[in-house]
Structures are given as structure tokens and as C-alpha cells.
């Protein structure tokens, strides 16, 4: 049995500095020194499975093997989400944006859930669009849902969740947009396939090139930028601005803002920003 403060694996200061450098260089994520215990805890589980004793052995793997690199990044990324998280954003979509789109009789709508994790955010969005009747007046709707972590994307693409997840979903959406699992899926629930078809899930590193060929009507990037340093955040905000249509909307997490890029947007409150 290990004594208190005794570590099972060696993680030197040099090792941790490498991890900080690697995560920032590769995916833009800033890991402050205060995250060292978290990093050690997550990596130690992986090292135990691989039969490694020192992080230098792990480093050799991620430097030589692309799949190991991806798995390493997945291990250190945080994926906390739920249906209708920060519900005021979805109320704004249904009560403000949808009436505007309907009045303008838009024929095409493009959305992006950036940092979609296990899929609750894009599925919430499509549920709101369906409940508000957007599909009745707009024939061409597409939601791109992206994340860095390939493991969470695999789960998201299935659209299957424990029945306990319904606790955060208002009843009117739950009845209309989800079905309960039966037989081997008993105890689970699933987004209806008729809604799932509007969503495309893809792996994407936010600090690399984006694949979009069209300007977007709405970007949801909530509680993602908190993991980036200030220069990276500002670069992303500028790129979001360029990717949005004039009048397009950017929604950020409750503790995030556009910072020094405020001249690019009109702030409507509650971390809702309209492209100038």
C-alpha cells in the first residue's frame, strides 16, 4: 500500500512542463500548475493499463504514434455537459431568433456546436428548433457538432443516454423529441432519428483550420475557451466573427466573454453576442 503523498508513477517537473507545452502547442489548451494533480491522476490510470513506470516512456509513445497522441489528448480534456445547460440560451433561440428567422422566411440555416462533448448540446438545439417549428418554414437545416475528443464523439453520434439524463429536459421537449429504450436498451433514452439526421459530428481541433464553406447563423462555444490562454481566446473570437453571417449570433459560457474583441459584436447580455 502506498504511503500518503507517495506517487505510484514518476512525473517530474520537466515531464509536467512538457505536458503543458504539448497541450498548448497541439490543441491550444492551457494547463496551469494547479492542474498538476489532475494531470497525474488521469495519466496514472493510462500508465497503469500500459504497464509503464515513468512518464518518459509515455512520452516516447505519444511522440511516435498518432493514435497514442489522440488518446493522450482525450485523457486530458474535460467533458462536462448536460441537456439544456445554461437554458437561457435556448430560450433566446426559441423566443427571439426563431421569430426573426420565420419573419425573414429564411431558406437555409447553419449552426455550429463547437466543443459538443457527448452531444447533449446539439441535441438540445435540434429539439428546440423542432419544438419551435423551424423545420416547417426552413427546408435546409444543418448542425455541425465538433469536439477534439474522439471518444465523446463516438458516444454523441449514437444519441443514446441513461434515462437519468432526462431530469434536465423540460417535459414538452422530452415527449416530442426523445424515445425510451426497450429490450437491451431499457434504462436508456434516444433522440428521435428524424431529428438526429440534422446533425453532423466531426473531430475538430479549434486552433487548426476549420472546414466550413458557408457562413453560419449561430455558433455555440460554451465553457470551452476557459481552457485556453487569453491570446488563443482572442484569436478564436476573431475567427468566430469571420465565420458568422452579418447578424449571426455567438453564444459563450457563463464565465466567458469576447474580451478585447467587443467592437466586433453587439452584446445582448447573458453571454449572447451578435456579429456587427
Swiss-Prot record:
CDD domains: AdoMet_MTases. Methylation of the membrane-bound methyl-accepting chemotaxis proteins (MCP) to form gamma-glutamyl methyl ester residues in MCP. This is Chemotaxis protein methyltransferase 3. The gene is cheR3. It comes from the Bacteria. GO terms for molecular function: protein methyltransferase activity; protein-glutamate O-methyltransferase activity. InterPro entries: Bact_Chemotaxis_MeTrfase, Chemotaxis_MeTrfase_CheR, CheR_C, CheR_MeTrfase, CheR_N, CheR_N_sf, SAM-dependent_MTases_sf. Residues 4-276 form the CheR-type methyltransferase domain.
Amino acid at each position: 500500500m502506498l504511503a500518503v503523498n507517495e506517487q505510484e508513477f514518476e512525473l517530474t517537473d520537466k515531464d509536467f512542463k512538457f505536458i503543458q507545452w504539448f497541450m498548448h502547442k497541439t490543441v491550444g489548451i492551457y494547463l496551469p500548475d494547479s492542474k498538476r494533480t489532475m494531470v497525474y491522476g488521469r495519466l496514472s490510470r493510462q500508465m497503469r493499463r500500459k504497464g509503464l513506470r515513468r512518464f518518459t516512456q509515455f512520452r516516447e509513445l505519444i511522440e511516435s504514434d498518432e493514435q497514442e497522441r489522440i488518446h493522450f489528448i482525450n485523457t486530458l480534456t474535460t467533458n462536462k455537459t448536460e441537456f439544456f445547460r445554461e437554458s437561457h440560451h435556448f430560450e433566446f433561440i426559441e423566443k427571439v431568433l426563431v421569430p426573426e428567422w420565420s419573419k425573414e422566411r429564411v431558406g437555409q440555416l447553419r449552426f455550429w456546436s463547437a466543443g459538443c462533448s457527448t452531444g447533449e448540446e446539439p441535441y438540445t438545439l435540434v429539439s428546440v428548433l423542432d419544438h419551435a417549428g423551424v423545420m416547417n418554414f426552413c427546408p435546409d437545416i444543418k448542425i455541425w457538432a465538433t469536439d477534439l475528443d474522439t471518444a465523446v464523439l463516438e458516444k454523441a453520434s449514437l444519441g443514446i443516454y441513461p434515462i437519468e439524463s432526462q431530469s434536465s429536459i423540460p417535459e414538452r421537449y422530452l415527449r416530442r423529441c426523445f424515445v425510451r429504450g426497450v429490450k437491451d436498451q431499457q434504462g436508456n433514452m434516444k433522440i428521435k432519428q428524424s431529428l438526429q439526421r440534422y446533425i453532423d459530428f466531426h473531430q475538430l481541433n479549434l486552433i487548426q483550420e476549420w472546414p466550413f464553406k458557408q457562413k453560419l447563423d449561430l455558433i455555440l462555444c460554451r465553457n470551452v475557451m476557459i481552457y485556453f490562454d487569453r491570446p488563443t481566446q482572442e484569436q478564436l473570437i476573431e475567427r468566430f466573427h469571420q465565420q458568422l453571417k452579418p447578424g449571426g449570433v455567438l453564444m459563450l459560457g457563463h464565465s466567458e466573454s469576447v474580451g478585447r474583441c467587443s467592437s466586433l459584436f453587439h452584446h445582448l447580455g447573458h453571454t449572447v453576442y451578435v456579429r456587427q
